[in-house]
Amino acid sequence: MQLHELMDPDYSDNPFPLYRKLHQQGPLIPAGDKIIISGSHAVVDALLNDRRVGKNYMESVRVRFGDDAAGLPLFQGISRMFLVLNPPDHNRL
């Protein structure tokens, strides 16, 4: 499984073949440097509810678009959005 498969137009048209592939490859699938994908609802639910797990949005921008991209206004703005914040900032609402 590669991260770019999620960006493929075929995925948008019919995601089910990729979903099958995710389930066949197991609960945690490496998809790039420091990127793990899961097609398991139970695994994703457990991770989202585990306070030890966080996300690093800007690191994912650097990996995907290069070091300079993290300084672009677009990514700086997104990095302050509620959905990409970790606790305690995410919990303030």
UniProtKB/Swiss-Prot annotation:
**Looking at the record's lineage, which domain of life comes first?**
Bacteria
Q: Which InterPro entries match?
A: Cyt_P450_sf
Q: What is this protein called?
A: Uncharacterized protein in aroQ 3'region
What GO MF terms are annotated?
A: heme binding; iron ion binding; monooxygenase activity; oxidoreductase activity, acting on paired donors, with incorporation or reduction of molecular oxygen
